[in-house]
Amino acid sequence: MNKEQILEAIKAMTVLELNDLVKAIEEEFGVTAAAPVVAGGAAAAAEEKTEFDVVLASAGAEKIKVIKVVREITGLGLKEAKEVVDNAPKALKEGVSKDEAEEIKAKLEEVGASVEVK
């Protein structure tokens, strides 16, 4: 099969068939058909982000365990920690390093909470 025959075969395909073809090519060759990201100001700003906010999205089923971890992380009293958990989504820590944010997220997810790092 030469290049022209391949192009003719592709022209005859439906949109669904083309979609399947693209997925098969991506899997076969380990590539992606996504448009490349243009390196610009936004990309540079994203790379430079050094401070992150840890937000408790929801407490999940193990609310008491989550309250204990929130107290440990924030240093809040029992009543204040319970209010934070009850009023989720709520920021727990702001302006922390990526490593610290990931550590906090792991502790909270370990006890069943949903956490976002922004």
UniProtKB/Swiss-Prot annotation:
Homodimer. Part of the ribosomal stalk of the 50S ribosomal subunit. Forms a multimeric L10(L12)X complex, where L10 forms an elongated spine to which 2 to 4 L12 dimers bind in a sequential fashion. Binds GTP-bound translation factors. GO terms for biological process: translation. The keyword Iron does not apply. Acetylation of Met-1 converts MA1 to MA2. It comes from the Bacteria. Belongs to the bacterial ribosomal protein bL12 family. GO terms for molecular function: mRNA binding; structural constituent of ribosome. The keyword Ribosomal protein applies. This is Large ribosomal subunit protein bL12. Forms part of the ribosomal stalk which helps the ribosome interact with GTP-bound translation factors. Is thus essential for accurate translation. The modification N-acetylmethionine is found at residue 1. Keywords: Acetylation, Ribonucleoprotein, Ribosomal protein. Pfam families: Ribosomal_L12 (PF00542), Ribosomal_L12_N (PF16320). One of its GO terms (cellular component) is cytosolic large ribosomal subunit. It comes from Micrococcus luteus.
